Amino acid sequence: MKKAIIIIGILILILLLPYVIKDRSYRSTNGPELSELKYSEIVFPNNYENIQLGGMLFLPEAKDTFPIAVIIHGSGRSRRNNKWYLSTVSHLQRNGIAVLLPDKRGCEKSEGAWIGSDFEQLATDTKSAVDYIINESNLHYSKIGLVGMSQGGWIAPIVATESSDISFIVSMSGASVTTDEQLDFEMVYNIEPYTYKFLARLIAPISVRQIRNKDYYSPIAGFDPIPYWKQIRIPVFFAFGGNDTNLPVDDCVKRLKAHNLEHFKIKTYPNGGHGILDPETYKVNQEFLNDLDDFINETNI
């Protein structure tokens, strides 16, 4: 009996050893403060779901006609002072591109609840933002496009298949695999520091099955974006960070090509993480930002 306890203790120690010796540090994104940017408050209805949405409109200086990009939020609660969003917004605004950054439903000044909403419901928030630009804003825009950030990359093609007013899509660290495949990849990364990778791969599917039943995840479980992407006939830019630990970048690129979507602009920034953040400065990668405004300004349909 004592021998069995000793053996079990040794096994536990071996399994916990990676947790003892590994150190994973976390840093917050570097970027501008909201107070440093010039914007206007807006309010617009989502008539599809009977809720009111708030947001911010960032206009470029001294430019009468301009492209306008609508940001689509990533997962979870969203706040206006999110420096990942603001870094992208600030760069676009400085380079002659207007940005409409809605408050995510249930966050800041927007009604509704993102928990329990599926992607089709969340897509109506973006469609409503586009409706606002066309019908109420009095803006002299040259074209309207979508910038889906992380989870927003799953929502963007839904909006574009239902609106003929969209001229371009940017998917920034957005997965082209299914939601469950993305979650499984992320779970392996989250579990792996506490044990060995082969065990993490065994444990991850169990965690995924549990998460599938959670209120915040069950409405989007099993979602596959490819059927939507295959309907898109406008310019698309998929941007990935090569060191992204939230989604399987190689699998995402392979899947796009496997479904004959290689005509989309697809670029991986080798040192970028999720959100295409520079690993040293923890700012959004400048090469990506330059590619972003070039893509938007050069897009013609």
Regions found by a protein language model. Give the residues of each.
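N-terminal cap/lid segment of alpha/beta-hydrolase-fold proteins
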Residues: 26-63
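Hydrolase active-site cap/lid region
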Residues: 27, 32, 162-209
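The serine-hydrolase catalytic nucleophile loop
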Residues: 78-89, 104, 250
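Conserved alpha/beta-hydrolase
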Residues: 89-109
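Alpha/beta-hydrolase active-site loop
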Residues: 116-137
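Short beta-strand/loop motif that positions the catalytic acidic residue
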Residues: 232, 238-240
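Short alpha-helix in the alpha/beta-hydrolase fold that links the catalytic acid
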Residues: 234, 248-257
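Catalytic active-site module of serine/aspartate enzymes centered on a nucleophile-bearing elbow/loop
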Residues: 272-275, 280-301
